[in-house]
Amino acid sequence: GGLEPFEQRLIEGMRKNGYDEQFARQIFQQILGFGEYGFPESHSASFAHLVYVSSWLKRYEPAAFTCALLNSQPMGFYSPSQLTQDLRRHEVPILPADAVVSEWECTLEDVRGEGGGEEQPALRLGLCLVKGLSQAGGERLVAARRAQTFADVGDLARRANLNAHDMQALAAAGALSSLSGHRRHALWDVAGVERMPALLDAAPIAEAQPLLAAPSEGENIVADYASLGLTLGRHPVALLRERLQRQRMFTAAELKALPHGRLARVTGLVTGRQRPGTASGVTFVTLEDETGMVNVIVWRDLAERQRKELLRSSLLTVYGTLEREGEVVHLIAGRLRDQTPLLGSLITRSRDFH
Protein backbone atom coordinates (compact mmCIF):
# COMPACT_ATOMS: atom_id res chain seq x y z
CA GLY A 1 0.00 0.00 0.00
CA GLY A 2 0.94 3.68 0.12
CA LEU A 3 1.62 4.05 -3.61
CA GLU A 4 -1.04 6.70 -4.33
CA PRO A 5 1.38 9.68 -4.06
CA PHE A 6 3.34 8.25 -7.00
CA GLU A 7 0.39 8.06 -9.40
CA GLN A 8 0.82 11.37 -11.20
CA ARG A 9 4.58 11.03 -11.39
CA LEU A 10 4.28 7.59 -13.01
CA ILE A 11 1.63 8.71 -15.50
CA GLU A 12 3.59 11.79 -16.56
CA GLY A 13 6.76 9.77 -16.95
CA MET A 14 5.03 7.15 -19.10
CA ARG A 15 3.44 9.85 -21.30
CA LYS A 16 6.85 11.41 -21.88
CA ASN A 17 8.04 7.99 -23.02
CA GLY A 18 5.28 7.67 -25.59
CA TYR A 19 2.54 5.80 -23.70
CA ASP A 20 -1.02 7.11 -23.72
CA GLU A 21 -2.65 8.21 -20.48
CA GLN A 22 -5.28 5.43 -20.39
CA PHE A 23 -2.61 2.74 -20.63
CA ALA A 24 -0.53 4.49 -17.96
CA ARG A 25 -3.48 4.60 -15.56
CA GLN A 26 -4.20 0.92 -16.21
CA ILE A 27 -0.60 0.05 -15.36
CA PHE A 28 -0.78 2.10 -12.17
CA GLN A 29 -3.95 0.30 -11.07
CA GLN A 30 -2.18 -3.03 -11.54
CA ILE A 31 0.78 -1.82 -9.51
CA LEU A 32 -1.61 -0.53 -6.87
CA GLY A 33 -3.26 -3.93 -6.61
CA PHE A 34 0.09 -5.69 -6.34
CA GLY A 35 1.12 -3.23 -3.64
CA GLU A 36 -1.64 -4.52 -1.39
CA TYR A 37 0.19 -7.82 -0.92
CA GLY A 38 3.44 -7.80 -2.88
CA PHE A 39 5.80 -5.86 -0.63
CA PRO A 40 7.69 -7.17 2.41
CA GLU A 41 5.65 -5.10 4.84
CA SER A 42 2.39 -6.54 3.53
CA HIS A 43 3.74 -10.08 3.55
CA SER A 44 5.10 -9.66 7.05
CA ALA A 45 1.86 -8.20 8.37
CA SER A 46 -0.33 -10.92 6.87
CA PHE A 47 1.98 -13.71 8.03
CA ALA A 48 2.30 -12.18 11.50
CA HIS A 49 -1.49 -12.05 11.74
CA LEU A 50 -1.79 -15.74 10.85
CA VAL A 51 0.94 -16.64 13.34
CA TYR A 52 -0.70 -14.61 16.10
CA VAL A 53 -4.15 -16.12 15.51
CA SER A 54 -2.73 -19.65 15.34
CA SER A 55 -0.66 -19.12 18.48
CA TRP A 56 -3.64 -17.71 20.35
CA LEU A 57 -5.85 -20.65 19.37
CA LYS A 58 -3.17 -23.19 20.30
CA ARG A 59 -2.66 -21.52 23.67
CA TYR A 60 -6.28 -20.91 24.69
CA GLU A 61 -8.28 -23.41 22.59
CA PRO A 62 -5.86 -26.30 21.98
CA ALA A 63 -8.60 -28.92 21.62
CA ALA A 64 -10.45 -26.97 18.93
CA PHE A 65 -7.19 -26.03 17.21
CA THR A 66 -6.00 -29.63 17.00
CA CYS A 67 -9.46 -30.85 15.97
CA ALA A 68 -9.45 -28.44 13.03
CA LEU A 69 -5.95 -29.50 11.97
CA LEU A 70 -6.89 -33.19 12.10
CA ASN A 71 -9.96 -32.53 9.98
CA SER A 72 -7.79 -30.72 7.43
CA GLN A 73 -5.38 -33.63 6.90
CA PRO A 74 -3.36 -34.32 4.88
CA MET A 75 -1.66 -30.96 5.27
CA GLY A 76 1.24 -29.13 6.77
CA PHE A 77 4.34 -30.28 8.56
CA TYR A 78 2.83 -32.21 11.46
CA SER A 79 1.20 -35.64 11.23
CA PRO A 80 -1.92 -36.70 13.17
CA SER A 81 0.37 -38.63 15.52
CA GLN A 82 2.46 -35.56 16.31
CA LEU A 83 -0.62 -33.39 16.76
CA THR A 84 -2.27 -35.80 19.20
CA GLN A 85 0.97 -36.44 21.11
CA ASP A 86 1.42 -32.70 21.59
CA LEU A 87 -2.18 -32.28 22.75
CA ARG A 88 -1.77 -35.07 25.29
CA ARG A 89 1.40 -33.46 26.63
CA HIS A 90 -0.76 -30.40 27.28
CA GLU A 91 -3.11 -32.64 29.29
CA VAL A 92 -6.10 -32.29 26.96
CA PRO A 93 -8.15 -35.51 26.94
CA ILE A 94 -8.44 -37.41 23.66
CA LEU A 95 -11.14 -40.03 23.16
CA PRO A 96 -10.76 -42.91 20.69
CA ALA A 97 -12.50 -43.40 17.37
CA ASP A 98 -15.65 -45.34 18.26
CA ALA A 99 -18.37 -46.51 15.88
CA VAL A 100 -20.95 -45.97 18.63
CA VAL A 101 -20.01 -42.32 19.23
CA SER A 102 -17.67 -40.83 16.60
CA GLU A 103 -18.74 -38.68 13.69
CA TRP A 104 -16.94 -38.94 10.37
CA GLU A 105 -14.74 -35.98 11.29
CA CYS A 106 -13.07 -35.34 14.64
CA THR A 107 -15.29 -33.49 17.12
CA LEU A 108 -15.21 -31.95 20.59
CA GLU A 109 -17.02 -33.44 23.58
CA ASP A 110 -17.71 -31.41 26.69
CA VAL A 111 -16.26 -33.34 29.61
CA ARG A 112 -15.63 -30.25 31.71
CA GLY A 113 -16.92 -30.01 35.24
CA GLU A 114 -18.79 -27.12 36.76
CA GLY A 115 -15.68 -25.64 38.34
CA GLY A 116 -14.84 -23.49 35.32
CA GLY A 117 -11.17 -22.64 35.00
CA GLU A 118 -9.16 -23.45 31.91
CA GLU A 119 -10.38 -26.99 31.42
CA GLN A 120 -10.65 -28.03 27.79
CA PRO A 121 -13.28 -30.13 26.04
CA ALA A 122 -12.14 -33.58 24.99
CA LEU A 123 -11.15 -34.29 21.41
CA ARG A 124 -13.04 -37.25 19.96
CA LEU A 125 -11.23 -38.90 17.07
CA GLY A 126 -13.34 -39.22 13.94
CA LEU A 127 -13.89 -42.25 11.75
CA CYS A 128 -12.01 -40.40 8.99
CA LEU A 129 -8.78 -41.46 10.71
CA VAL A 130 -9.57 -45.18 10.34
CA LYS A 131 -7.36 -46.44 7.53
CA GLY A 132 -9.27 -48.45 4.94
CA LEU A 133 -12.72 -47.18 5.93
CA SER A 134 -14.43 -45.54 2.98
CA GLN A 135 -16.00 -42.13 3.53
CA ALA A 136 -19.28 -43.35 2.06
CA GLY A 137 -19.29 -46.27 4.49
CA GLY A 138 -18.42 -44.06 7.44
CA GLU A 139 -21.16 -41.59 6.62
CA ARG A 140 -23.73 -44.40 6.24
CA LEU A 141 -22.67 -45.68 9.65
CA VAL A 142 -23.21 -42.28 11.26
CA ALA A 143 -26.61 -41.86 9.57
CA ALA A 144 -27.77 -45.33 10.65
CA ARG A 145 -26.66 -44.70 14.24
CA ARG A 146 -28.59 -41.43 14.39
CA ALA A 147 -31.73 -43.32 13.43
CA GLN A 148 -31.17 -45.97 16.13
CA THR A 149 -28.27 -47.10 18.29
CA PHE A 150 -26.55 -50.30 17.22
CA ALA A 151 -27.39 -53.49 19.10
CA ASP A 152 -24.25 -55.36 18.04
CA VAL A 153 -21.67 -55.66 15.28
CA GLY A 154 -24.05 -57.53 13.00
CA ASP A 155 -26.70 -54.84 13.42
CA LEU A 156 -24.14 -52.17 12.53
CA ALA A 157 -22.95 -53.98 9.41
CA ARG A 158 -26.50 -54.64 8.26
CA ARG A 159 -28.06 -51.21 8.79
CA ALA A 160 -25.00 -49.24 7.64
CA ASN A 161 -24.61 -51.62 4.67
CA LEU A 162 -20.87 -51.94 5.23
CA ASN A 163 -18.78 -54.36 3.22
CA ALA A 164 -16.20 -56.72 4.67
CA HIS A 165 -13.33 -54.31 4.01
CA ASP A 166 -14.99 -51.48 5.96
CA MET A 167 -15.90 -53.77 8.86
CA GLN A 168 -12.38 -55.17 9.09
CA ALA A 169 -10.98 -51.63 9.09
CA LEU A 170 -13.22 -50.65 12.02
CA ALA A 171 -12.29 -53.78 13.96
CA ALA A 172 -8.56 -53.35 13.34
CA ALA A 173 -8.73 -49.74 14.54
CA GLY A 174 -10.45 -50.69 17.79
CA ALA A 175 -13.50 -48.68 16.72
CA LEU A 176 -15.87 -51.57 17.58
CA SER A 177 -14.70 -51.85 21.19
CA SER A 178 -18.01 -50.55 22.58
CA LEU A 179 -19.82 -53.41 20.83
CA SER A 180 -17.28 -56.24 20.91
CA GLY A 181 -14.58 -55.48 23.43
CA HIS A 182 -10.94 -55.68 22.41
CA ARG A 183 -9.62 -55.99 18.86
CA ARG A 184 -9.49 -59.78 18.72
CA HIS A 185 -13.11 -60.12 19.79
CA ALA A 186 -14.08 -57.45 17.25
CA LEU A 187 -12.27 -59.24 14.42
CA TRP A 188 -13.97 -62.51 15.45
CA ASP A 189 -17.39 -60.85 15.42
CA VAL A 190 -16.73 -59.27 12.03
CA ALA A 191 -15.67 -62.63 10.61
CA GLY A 192 -18.93 -64.10 11.89
CA VAL A 193 -20.95 -61.40 10.15
CA GLU A 194 -19.06 -62.06 6.89
CA ARG A 195 -19.91 -65.77 7.05
CA MET A 196 -23.61 -65.18 7.73
CA PRO A 197 -25.75 -66.26 4.74
CA ALA A 198 -27.82 -63.45 3.23
CA LEU A 199 -31.03 -65.31 4.13
CA LEU A 200 -30.13 -65.05 7.83
CA ASP A 201 -28.91 -61.44 7.81
CA ALA A 202 -31.58 -60.23 10.20
CA ALA A 203 -31.46 -63.26 12.50
CA PRO A 204 -29.96 -62.75 15.98
CA ILE A 205 -26.60 -64.42 16.59
CA ALA A 206 -26.84 -66.74 19.59
CA GLU A 207 -23.27 -68.02 19.41
CA ALA A 208 -21.26 -67.22 22.54
CA GLN A 209 -18.20 -65.06 22.01
CA PRO A 210 -15.00 -67.11 22.50
CA LEU A 211 -12.60 -66.23 25.31
CA LEU A 212 -9.82 -64.68 23.26
CA ALA A 213 -6.84 -63.20 25.07
CA ALA A 214 -6.62 -59.43 24.83
CA PRO A 215 -3.70 -58.04 22.82
CA SER A 216 -0.66 -56.95 24.80
CA GLU A 217 0.16 -53.27 25.21
CA GLY A 218 2.81 -53.51 22.52
CA GLU A 219 0.48 -55.34 20.14
CA ASN A 220 -2.17 -52.65 20.63
CA ILE A 221 0.32 -49.88 19.89
CA VAL A 222 1.49 -51.63 16.71
CA ALA A 223 -2.15 -52.08 15.65
CA ASP A 224 -2.93 -48.44 16.46
CA TYR A 225 -0.20 -47.13 14.17
CA ALA A 226 -1.14 -49.60 11.42
CA SER A 227 -4.85 -48.74 11.50
CA LEU A 228 -4.91 -45.09 12.62
CA GLY A 229 -1.40 -43.73 12.20
CA LEU A 230 -1.34 -42.78 15.90
CA THR A 231 -1.86 -44.25 19.35
CA LEU A 232 -3.67 -43.08 22.45
CA GLY A 233 -1.68 -45.60 24.45
CA ARG A 234 1.81 -44.97 25.72
CA HIS A 235 4.32 -43.50 23.31
CA PRO A 236 6.39 -46.28 21.69
CA VAL A 237 9.60 -44.83 23.12
CA ALA A 238 8.09 -44.97 26.63
CA LEU A 239 8.01 -48.76 26.33
CA LEU A 240 11.76 -48.68 25.73
CA ARG A 241 12.56 -46.12 28.42
CA GLU A 242 13.95 -48.55 30.99
CA ARG A 243 16.35 -49.93 28.40
CA LEU A 244 17.28 -46.44 27.21
CA GLN A 245 17.95 -45.30 30.77
CA ARG A 246 20.49 -48.08 31.12
CA GLN A 247 22.16 -46.62 28.03
CA ARG A 248 22.12 -43.19 29.75
CA MET A 249 19.83 -41.62 27.18
CA PHE A 250 18.27 -38.26 27.98
CA THR A 251 14.61 -37.54 27.28
CA ALA A 252 13.58 -34.54 25.20
CA ALA A 253 12.40 -32.81 28.37
CA GLU A 254 15.71 -33.44 30.15
CA LEU A 255 17.69 -31.96 27.26
CA LYS A 256 16.02 -28.60 27.83
CA ALA A 257 17.62 -28.36 31.29
CA LEU A 258 21.17 -29.13 30.14
CA PRO A 259 23.79 -26.37 29.73
CA HIS A 260 25.21 -25.18 26.43
CA GLY A 261 28.05 -27.38 25.18
CA ARG A 262 27.05 -30.47 27.17
CA LEU A 263 27.60 -33.85 25.52
CA ALA A 264 24.28 -35.69 25.30
CA ARG A 265 22.62 -38.70 23.75
CA VAL A 266 18.95 -39.10 22.90
CA THR A 267 16.73 -41.65 21.16
CA GLY A 268 13.44 -40.90 19.43
CA LEU A 269 11.13 -41.65 16.54
CA VAL A 270 12.15 -39.79 13.40
CA THR A 271 9.23 -37.53 12.49
CA GLY A 272 10.90 -35.33 9.90
CA ARG A 273 14.01 -34.73 7.82
CA GLN A 274 14.63 -31.42 6.06
CA ARG A 275 17.50 -30.16 3.91
CA PRO A 276 16.71 -26.59 2.78
CA GLY A 277 18.49 -25.42 -0.34
CA THR A 278 19.93 -22.46 1.58
CA ALA A 279 21.38 -24.61 4.38
CA SER A 280 24.68 -25.56 2.68
CA GLY A 281 24.01 -29.27 2.90
CA VAL A 282 22.89 -29.28 6.53
CA THR A 283 20.10 -31.75 7.36
CA PHE A 284 17.61 -30.98 10.12
CA VAL A 285 16.09 -34.02 11.82
CA THR A 286 13.19 -33.98 14.29
CA LEU A 287 12.98 -36.74 16.89
CA GLU A 288 10.03 -37.44 19.18
CA ASP A 289 9.84 -39.30 22.47
CA GLU A 290 7.19 -39.47 25.19
CA THR A 291 8.22 -36.07 26.60
CA GLY A 292 8.49 -33.94 23.48
CA MET A 293 10.53 -33.08 20.40
CA VAL A 294 14.28 -32.86 19.78
CA ASN A 295 15.74 -30.76 16.97
CA VAL A 296 18.92 -32.31 15.57
CA ILE A 297 21.44 -30.67 13.23
CA VAL A 298 23.47 -33.01 11.02
CA TRP A 299 26.40 -31.41 9.20
CA ARG A 300 27.12 -32.45 5.62
CA ASP A 301 30.22 -34.53 6.37
CA LEU A 302 28.40 -36.66 8.95
CA ALA A 303 25.39 -36.99 6.65
CA GLU A 304 27.65 -38.35 3.92
CA ARG A 305 29.45 -40.77 6.27
CA GLN A 306 26.26 -42.08 7.87
CA ARG A 307 23.82 -41.69 5.00
CA LYS A 308 22.13 -45.03 5.69
CA GLU A 309 21.46 -44.27 9.36
CA LEU A 310 20.29 -40.75 8.53
CA LEU A 311 17.85 -41.70 5.79
CA ARG A 312 16.55 -45.13 6.78
CA SER A 313 16.15 -45.05 10.56
CA SER A 314 12.68 -44.92 12.08
CA LEU A 315 14.09 -44.99 15.62
CA LEU A 316 17.33 -43.03 15.81
CA THR A 317 19.90 -42.47 18.54
CA VAL A 318 21.95 -39.28 18.26
CA TYR A 319 25.19 -38.70 20.15
CA GLY A 320 26.07 -35.03 20.06
CA THR A 321 26.66 -31.65 21.65
CA LEU A 322 23.89 -29.48 23.02
CA GLU A 323 23.63 -26.01 21.54
CA ARG A 324 21.54 -23.49 23.45
CA GLU A 325 20.48 -19.97 22.55
CA GLY A 326 18.00 -18.71 25.11
CA GLU A 327 15.10 -21.15 25.18
CA VAL A 328 16.03 -22.67 21.80
CA VAL A 329 17.88 -25.98 22.08
CA HIS A 330 19.47 -28.06 19.32
CA LEU A 331 21.58 -31.19 19.39
CA ILE A 332 24.56 -31.03 17.02
CA ALA A 333 24.99 -34.63 15.89
CA GLY A 334 28.38 -36.28 16.21
CA ARG A 335 27.29 -39.87 15.62
CA LEU A 336 24.08 -41.61 14.56
CA ARG A 337 22.84 -45.07 15.45
CA ASP A 338 19.89 -46.87 13.89
CA GLN A 339 17.73 -48.39 16.64
CA THR A 340 14.80 -49.33 14.40
CA PRO A 341 14.98 -53.08 15.25
CA LEU A 342 13.84 -52.18 18.78
CA LEU A 343 10.45 -51.22 17.32
CA GLY A 344 9.75 -54.78 16.19
CA SER A 345 6.84 -54.79 13.76
CA LEU A 346 5.86 -51.18 14.51
CA ILE A 347 5.85 -49.06 11.34
CA THR A 348 5.97 -45.28 11.68
CA ARG A 349 6.07 -42.55 9.06
CA SER A 350 8.20 -39.41 8.81
CA ARG A 351 7.83 -36.30 6.69
CA ASP A 352 11.01 -36.10 4.65
CA PHE A 353 12.44 -33.35 2.45
CA HIS A 354 9.18 -31.53 1.69
Mark where each language-model region is.
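Noncatalytic, beta-rich nucleic-acid-contacting surfaces in large DNA/RNA-processing enzymes
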Residues: 1-354
